[in-house]
Amino acid sequence: MGAIINFLRGLAERIAKGNKSKLYIGGVLITFTVVFLSGISGWIIERLFFFFEINNPIATSLLFSFVLSSSLASRSLNKSIFEIINLVSHENVEYNLNNLRQKLSFIVGRDVDNLNKNEILRALAETASENSVDGVFAPLFWMFIGIFLWQFNNLMPGPLAMAWIFKASSTIDSMLGYKDGNLKWLGFSGAKLDDIMTWIPARIVLITLPLCCRPKQPIIKTIQQAWEDGIVDPSPNSGISEAIFAYCAEVRMGGVNFYKGKKKTKPLIAKSYPIANINSIKRILNLILRLQFIWVLGILLIIKLINL
């Protein structure tokens, strides 16, 4: 998918030659093309599964489950974070800083060249919190929408098609959704689509995550404080997801980051809690797994009730 986006980006930039309107239209066409190809690919695979299920339903179900699980990024995110945590735990952490920064650069968008140990840990906490929605809960939500659509007609886009549509929008946003140079116009439509598709999942996470822990205050108050801290973030979704994880994992987030050399100060979240450490990052990862389990059970229960 990344290769297709890069190819289409280069093509659009050559045709537009810096013209803002043409770049914007090119971004719309890139978004439509990549999302359509991803959705139709998922839909075709779903049709094949329906066709072959007649002969071997068990094998088809197992294969279909494997393909669906490929839409979730929880395992790869956990692996990357634990690799960095293990390096941070090393006695001679200062010696490992360059290696830490290099590994961190693969999973964060901020500049990492000058980050110290505490800033690396904060980056891990914030990335785990934000990416849990993009990588786990939003795909699960859109899988559920696909399953729901099948209740009306199994020729409609199902869980795989809907999950791949979301992953396409998320990938476009991660590659083109920047506000500098040509990308300010070329990546606009992809970024907005990703915001729209993540809007509901982020708010469901806000409401359901406190069920996975024992917050120091009433659940309603925890949700309210997370909302108040998160809503001031320029992003309509990442601030909310970071805030609820910050309160549930009892860790402070936010502060100064640099993106391509430009300083960006994000508001402090859960400022009464301590800064990120290894234990708080592990708590965040544990919360993600717990909430993922609750969501899957909830989806299965809703499907069962629909089919009654």
Stretches found by the model and what they are:
Residues 1-169, 177-308:
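Hydrophobic alpha-helical transmembrane segments
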Residues 174:
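Glycine-rich phosphate/dinucleotide-binding loop and adjoining beta-alpha-beta core of small-molecule
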